[in-house]
Structure formats: C-alpha cells, structure tokens
Amino acid sequence: MMNDKDLSTWQTFRRLWPTISPYKAGLIVAAIALILNAASDTFMLSLLKPLLDDGFGNSNSSILKWMPLAVIGLMVVRGVTGFVSSYCISWVSGKVVMHIRRRLFSHMMGMPVSFFDQQSTGTLLSRITYDSEQVAASSSSALVTVVREGASIIGLFIMMFYYSWQLSLILIVIAPIVSISIRLVSKRFRNISKNMQNTMGEVTTSAEQMLKGHKEVLIFGGQKVETERFDAVSNRMRQQGMKLVSASSISDPIIQLIASFALALVLYAASFPSVMETLTAGTITVVFSAMIALMRPLKSLTNVNTQFQRGMAACQTLFSILDMEQEKDEGKLEVERAKGDIEFRHVTFYYPGKDTPALNDINIHLEAGKTVALVGRSGSGKSTIANLLTRFYDVSEGSILLDGHDLRDYRLGALRNQVALVSQNVHLFNDTVANNIAYARNEQYSRAEIEEAARMAYAMDFINKMEHGLDTVIGENGIMLSGGQRQRIAIARALLRNCPILILDEATSALDTESERAIQAALDELQKNRTSLVIAHRLSTIEKADEIVVIEDGRIVERGVHAELLVQQGVYAQLNRMQFGQ
C-alpha cells in the first residue's frame, strides 16, 4: 500500500495549481460569467423594493411598464452567463483531467518493474481513472460553487446593508460560527475520501481478477469465493460512502439551524420602533428575501467542501505516486549494435523487502554468438537472471558486463535495444497481427519484412486463414489466438527486431510437440550469430546449447554440456530422468 504524504489542503492545492494555471484564461472568463450570473440574481431580488414601494404602494405606472423588460433582460443575462461559465469550466476540467492522466501515465511508464510487482493493476487503474476525475471535480464543480455562490453572498450582503445596515449586522455574528462548522467537518471529509479511493482500488482489483481469470473461476468452482470477496470490498465502499453522506448531511442542518437563529433575531430586531421607522414594505421584503436567499449559497458552500476535500485527497494519492522515484537511467554509453559478450561477475540479488537472496554469487560468461541455457526447478532464480540482464532490476552485489562495460554504464534505451525477449507470458495488444509483430516500430519495417518474420516463425499458416490476414485485429492480449499462436507472434516479433542478444524464457512452453518442432527450427536459425540466454523447461530444447547452467536455490550447482551433465548423475540428470520418465 502506498503512503500518502500528510499535506494540508492548501499545500496540496498549491501543487495542483501549476496544472490548472495554463488554462487560467478559461477560468477568468468563467469567473466573470459566474459573477455576472450571481449579480443578475441579486438585481432581480432588488427589483422587489421599487415594485412594492413605488409600483404598487404609490401606483407609479412607469415602473410597472419597464419592470417586465428589466426582468427579461436579467433572465437573458443569466442564461448567457450560465452557458458561458458551464462551457468554460467543462473545457478547463477536461484539460486538467487530460493533463493529470498524461502525466500519471507517463510517470508510471518510467517506474521500475518492482513498482508494478508491488501494486495491483486494479489499484493503478483506479488512480488513473477514478482519482483523476476526483481532482477535476475539485478544480471545476468546487470552483463554480465557490465563485458563483461567493458572489451571490457578497452581492446579497451589499444589498442588505444598503437597505438596512442595522438588520444586516446581525448576520455578521453568525459568519464565524459557520466558518468553524465548515472547518470541523473538512478533516472528516478528507479522511473518508482517502479511504474511499483506496477501497475503489480494491473493488477494481477484485473485478479485474474475476474478469481475467473467469475460466479458472468456472473450472475450479470459485464463484462463491469471488462473490464473497467482491461483496466484502463493495460493502466497505458502501460503508465509506455512508460515512461521507452522514458527515455531509449533518453539516447541512447545522448551517440551516444557525441561519434560522439569525432570521429570528432579525424579526425580533425589526419589531423595535426605532428600526421600524426606517423600514418600508419593500425594504423589509427585500431584506428578508435576501436573508432567505442566503440559505442556498451557504448550503452550497458547505456541500462543496465535501467534493473539494475529496479532490484534495485524490491529489495527495496521485502526488504520492508522482513523488516516487522513476527507474534510474544514469548511463551515458550508447551502442548501435553490441557484440554480445556478457559476463555475470559474483552477482547477488535481493528482491525489495526480502532478506533471502534470490541469486547468490552467480558467475556466468556468455561469449558473443554462443548459447547458454539455464535449467532448474521452478523458483530457482532462472527468470531473475533474465530480469537482471535487461535491467528490469539492478544487481544488489557484483556486476554484469556487456562487451566489457557495466550494464549501468549504458543508457537504458540503448541497452534494451540490444535485447529481444520471448517469454512464456506473452503479452499482445488489441491491434492487428502486423502491428503486434512490429510493435512500437511500425514505420521502421516494411510489410515484406513483417511477413518474412511471421513466415520464419511458422505463423503465416494460421495468419493466412484469418479473415484479414496480417491486418486482423486479435483482441485484448490476443484473445482470438491459441497459446501456441500467441507464442509464434512473439517469436516473429523477436525475429523482426534482429537484436544481437536473445532471451528465450521458456519460449516453447505453450506449444504442442508438433508446433515445438516447427518453431525450434526457426529458433535455431534465430540463435545463429547471436548471444542467447535460454531458460528451459523442456530439456530437449537445450541439448545443443554451448553451456548448460543448473540453478538451485539461487546458486549454480552444475555447469557443462548436455552429455557431461548426464554422466555426472547430478541435479540435471535427475531432472532429465523425471521429464523423460526414465
């Protein structure tokens, strides 16, 4: 779970302001429109005095003639300013959400693999979607309410003091009480909002796990377990929502109760003869109407605090991610195409938060153009070696050299351009077959090159059977393809990149025997003149490796070629007998 920095609301808003400020022109236009909108309401109310005192009281027909035109004019102003303010605020809000999401997305892409290993996908998706929307709410809806209702309150106060300053002074007494009430509930709102955002991440994670693993849920009868899990997180979300509603609902009647006392005091004060002498029917109507009209903006300002605090809590959550250090890329060394000589020197590695090393004093030399296979039981540390070679993680002790230079001396982009990776967990994008093969480099390769890579990976036989061939959209993570077909697309991607270093992380594990034989020929061709690190589950695929390294509990326990290791009758020979049933 991420730790949110304990920033005050003001400090949080100050950090948010640089995101909003580029669009301040829209905010200024919206603010002017909102003030004019509020002013039109105030002027509409002020028309009551001349209407009652002169129009009806003194039978002044001229007032009755221009009054309808004034009402129509004010309503036109109100309608136009309402449209302008809504449009400008929506424009600013959309820009702010887009900016925050882009910044968050870009920052997450630069985070180390360890960050994603420690966070659930659902929680991160909730940060990009739900939390970003909450921030927009604090910078749009809250702003509308504060400016419009604030202008209304100021306008109503000015009008009240203009007509009867004696009665209006009573309202000044309740202002500090209202302020204290709002402050008391603000902290409560912020804490509940933080909990709601965390719970929303849990809801998203629970739903995502069920959707992605629905086949496993069905085959293992996990419907009850998943339903109970989802019910639990949904109920926590409901409870947090009810706490928020309770806090908000309590604040409303408190404000109204305070206002009712103020109205009662005004009525009492108006009964004094010295005050009554200064009042007319129009004056008392306008003052009382203004006091009642103040209830709505006061209530709105109280409610906006809920949304504003929710947005500020979301800001703190997002800032906690943006404050995390991105993947270190301090290397300066550039290389167009490496020779591919790789050496692990006394490499020890601990996963973050672990006391036991995943790898302990690993020494491996992969000569350029040679193939080294890593063999061992599940969890022995084979894939960790591949993760270190690509610098998904950095070594804890020791060093890894590429062509005599420490991997950390290379710029990350330059280093990873030297490596093609085919793993057992193939990820494909919801795009065409061709775009998946040429992923991120569509403009670099011709159609003929893409097709040739697919042919060498023995993928064209099933691609040609698709409705649109290479232009067929394969769905999210290649849902329309079988496991073997997805693996062949990944191999075609590696063939097309033509990198000097190749990592095969159980690349044929998802293939049937016939497909494996077909693709093994392509892999043999792919490995020629390339430094290959092969992590093997099927030992038959690595019998021709230049060296086989056996890993056990993060240590190298055996090394040699296939025939030598069989003669030693050690761990490799035991694994071989288990696999072939000897």
UniProtKB/Swiss-Prot annotation:
Main location per the UniProt record: membrane
Sequence ranges assigned to domain ABC transporter in this UniProt record: 342-578
Name used for this protein in its record: ATP-dependent lipid A-core flippase
Its EC number(s): 7.5.2.6
UniProt-listed SUPFAM superfamilies: ABC transporter transmembrane region (SSF90123), P-loop containing nucleoside triphosphate hydrolases (SSF52540)
Molecular function terms from GO: ABC-type transporter activity; ATP binding; ATP hydrolysis activity; ATPase-coupled lipid transmembrane transporter activity
Organism: Yersinia pestis
GO-annotated biological processes: transmembrane transport
A GO CC term attached to the entry: plasma membrane
PROSITE patterns, per database record: ABC_TM1F (PS50929), ABC_TRANSPORTER_1 (PS00211), ABC_TRANSPORTER_2 (PS50893), MSBA (PS51239)
Taxonomic classification: Bacteria, Pseudomonadati, Pseudomonadota, Gammaproteobacteria, Enterobacterales
Enzyme class: translocase
